[in-house]
From Swiss-Prot:
One of the Pfam families matching this protein, by short name: APOC4
Function: May participate in lipoprotein metabolism.
GO biological process: lipid transport; positive regulation of triglyceride storage; triglyceride homeostasis
Protein name: Apolipoprotein C-IV
Secreted found in the keyword field: yes
Signal sequence bounds: 1-27
InterPro entries found in the cross-reference section: APOC4
Compartment list: Secreted
Organism: Aotus nancymaae
Amino acid sequence: MSLLRHRLQALPSLCLCVLVLACIGACQSEAYEGTTSPPPEQKMSRWNLVQSRLKELLEPAVTRTRDRWQWLGWSLSTLQGFMQTYYDDHLRDLGPRTKTWLLESKDGLLNKTYSLCPRLLCADKN
């Protein structure tokens, strides 16, 4: 049952990642429409051969996924709006919150350390 609970907790993060990747793929395909093939000197590179082979293998799956998700009507502006709202709600004050938490943790740890330390070693030297 514990494994199922962990899977359910990870599901929203996984869905967000899949959604972001699908939107990025859709935006990139729109940006590359109408471009020609790479120049001949790039075609001969081994890395470009690997890239082209991966593209051959993955392009049908990406196209099918994009077609299936098309009914959602997601666009770049929709994703940007969602990400901006998420940032405003959860991440805007992350720096100050983290700094405060670290200072409180440090103070708490020092207090625990002093309480465990023998009086002879940790006595205030006033």
